[in-house]
C-alpha cells in the first residue's frame, strides 16, 4: 500500500505509528495512523500489519511472563535489546510498504512486551521489555514508550490504558456503551452517556484459549472456535475456575499471565480430566461468563458492547457473549469502520500524540491513580 498526501491539503494531520504486542505474544502489531490536531476526535488507520515473533524468542517471553523462567541480568538485557530490535523491524517494514518517508512520522508509540505486571503490594511495579532507545535509533523516529509505569508510580494499576482512547473515538451522548478487548486478557471500558468512564480487566481470554489449544494441536489458535464448539461445557470445572478470588475483586483491577496460565487450569483437572475439547469449551465459557458478569454488575444499563481484539473473529465466543447479554447489542467494532485487530496499536499511537502534545493519557477513574498524568518517556530521533 502506497500512501500519498492529498495535494489539496498542504497541512494534513500528523502521522503516528503504534506498536503493540499483548499477553498472547502472538505477533507485533504495527499501525500507521493519522490523528487530528486535537488528538481527541479522529484517528484514521492508514496502514497496518502484524509481524511474527521469532519462535525461540516468543517461547522465552512466554516463559518469563508466566514465571517459568528466571532470567539472569545478562539475559534480561539481551532480551530487552532483542524485543526493541523486533519492534523497530516491525515499524520499518510497515513504513517501507507504505512508501512514506520516516521523517513524515511525528512519533512512534511503543507498548513493549510485558513480562511482569504486579500492581499490588508494598511497592507495585510493571515491566515491559523493548528498548525504546534502540527503536528510535533504528527508525530515526522519536519514540514514546514505557507508558504504564507513571500511572503505577501515581498509585494506579497501570492498566488498562485504552479507555481514554476508547472514549475519544467511541464515546456517545445517545447510549451507554462498552468496549471489550478480547486479547490475551479480556478488558472492558465502560462509557456511559454521563458520568466517569470505568475500565478494568475481567479475566483470561485468548491467553488460556490459545495455550490449551496449542497443547493439543500444531496450529497456534482455535480457528473460528471450532475446537471449542466440538466440546461441551464442564460445569464442575467452570465452577472451580470461577471460584478464584480474583474474579470478585472490585475495579480498578488488572491481571496477566502471571495470574492466569495453564498450570492454573491443570490444577483443577484432577483426578478425572474432561476431554481436551470440553476444556476448550469451558475456557471459552469462562471468558464469556466473567465478561458478562462484570458488565452487568458495573454498568447494568449498557446498550451496546463493541468487541475488538482477536476474539472478535471467534463466532463461538461472540455467540456466548450475546447469549449472556440478551438485552445488549453485541457487535465487532468493524461495524464502525475500525479494524478489531489493530485498535490497541492505534491506541498507543494516540498515547504518543497525547504525550507529545502535553496531554494526559490515563483516566484515574479507570486505573485508580491519584490524578491525570503524562504517560511514557520520550526518546528523540
From Swiss-Prot:
Q: In which pathway does it act?
A: Amino-sugar metabolism; 1,6-anhydro-N-acetylmuramate degradation; Cell wall biogenesis; peptidoglycan recycling
Binding-site residues, ATP:
22-29
CDD domains with a match to the protein in the record: ASKHA_NBD_ANMK
- Asked whether the UniProt record includes Nucleotide-binding among its keywords, one would answer yes
User: Keywords for this entry?
Assistant: ATP-binding, Carbohydrate metabolism, Kinase, Nucleotide-binding, Transferase
Q: So what does this thing catalyse?
A: 1,6-anhydro-N-acetyl-beta-muramate + ATP + H2O = N-acetyl-D-muramate 6-phosphate + ADP + H(+)
| MF terms in GO | ATP binding; kinase activity; phosphotransferase activity, alcohol group as acceptor
**EC number(s) given by UniProt:** 2.7.1.170
GO terms in the biological process aspect are: 1,6-anhydro-N-acetyl-beta-muramic acid catabolic process; amino sugar metabolic process; peptidoglycan turnover
Function, in words: Catalyzes the specific phosphorylation of 1,6-anhydro-N-acetylmuramic acid (anhMurNAc) with the simultaneous cleavage of the 1,6-anhydro ring, generating MurNAc-6-P. Is required for the utilization of anhMurNAc either imported from the medium or derived from its own cell wall murein, and thus plays a role in cell wall recycling.
Q: Which family does it belong to?
A: Belongs to the anhydro-N-acetylmuramic acid kinase family.
> What is the protein name given in its UniProt record?
Anhydro-N-acetylmuramic acid kinase
Q: Which organism is it from?
A: Xylella fastidiosa (strain 9a5c)
The coding gene here is anmK
Amino acid at each position: 500500500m502506497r500512501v500519498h498526501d492529498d495535494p489539496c491539503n498542504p497541512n494534513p494531520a500528523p502521522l503516528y505509528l503504534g506498536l503493540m504486542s499483548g499477553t498472547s505474544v502472538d505477533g507485533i502489531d504495527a499501525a500507521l495512523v493519522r490523528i487530528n490536531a486535537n488528538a481527541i476526535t479522529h484517528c484514521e488507520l492508514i496502514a497496518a500489519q502484524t509481524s511474527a515473533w521469532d519462535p525461540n524468542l516468543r517461547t522465552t517471553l512466554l516463559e518469563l511472563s508466566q514465571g517459568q523462567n528466571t532470567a539472569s541480568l545478562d539475559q534480561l538485557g539481551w532480551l530487552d535489546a532483542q524485543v526493541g530490535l523486533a519492534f523497530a523491524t516491525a515499524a520499518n517494514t510497515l513504513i517501507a510498504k507504505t512508501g512514506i518517508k520516516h521523517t513524515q512520522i511525528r512519533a512512534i508509540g511503543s507498548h513493549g512486551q510485558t513480562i511482569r505486571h504486579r500492581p499490588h503490594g508494598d511497592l507495585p511495579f510493571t515491566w515491559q521489555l523493548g528498548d525504546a532507545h534502540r527503536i528510535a535509533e533504528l527508525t530515526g523516529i522519536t519514540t514514546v514508550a514505557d507508558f504504564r509505569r507513571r500511572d503505577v508510580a501515581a498509585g494506579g494499576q497501570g492498566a488498562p490504558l485504552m479507555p481514554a482512547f476508547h472514549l475519544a473515538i467511541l464515546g456517545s451522548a445517545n447510549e451507554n456503551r462498552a468496549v471489550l478487548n478480547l486479547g490475551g486478557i479480556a478488558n472492558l471500558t465502560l462509557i456511559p452517556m454521563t458520568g466517569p468512564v470505568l475500565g478494568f480487566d475481567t479475566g483470561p481470554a485468548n491467553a488460556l484459549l490459545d495455550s490449551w489449544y496449542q497443547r493439543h494441536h500444531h496450529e497456534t489458535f482455535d480457528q473460528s472456535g471450532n475446537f471449542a464448539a466440538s466440546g461441551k461445557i464442564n460445569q464442575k470445572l467452570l465452577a472451580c475456575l470461577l471460584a478464584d478470588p480474583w474474579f470478585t475483586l472490585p475495579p480498578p483491577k488488572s491481571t496477566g499471565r502471571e495470574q492466569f496460565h495453564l498450570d492454573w487450569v491443570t490444577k483443577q483437572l484432577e483426578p478425572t480430566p474432561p476431554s481436551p475439547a470440553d476444556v476448550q469449551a469451558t475456557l471459552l465459557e469462562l471468558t464469556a461468563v466473567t465478561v458478562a458478569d462484570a458488565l452487568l454488575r458495573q454498568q447494568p444499563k449498557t446498550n451496546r458492547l463493541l468487541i475488538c481484539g482477536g476474539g472478535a473473529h471467534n463466532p463461538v465466543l461472540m455467540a456466548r457473549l450475546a447469549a449472556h447479554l440478551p438485552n445488549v447489542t453485541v457487535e465487532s467494532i468493524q461495524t464502525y469502520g475500525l479494524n478489531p485487530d489493530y485498535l490497541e496499536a492505534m491506541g498507543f499511537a494516540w498515547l504518543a500524540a497525547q504525550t507529545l502534545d502535553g496531554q494526559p493519557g490515563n483516566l484515574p477513574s479507570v486505573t485508580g491513580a491519584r490524578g491525570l498524568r503524562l504517560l511514557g518517556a520520550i526518546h528523540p530521533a
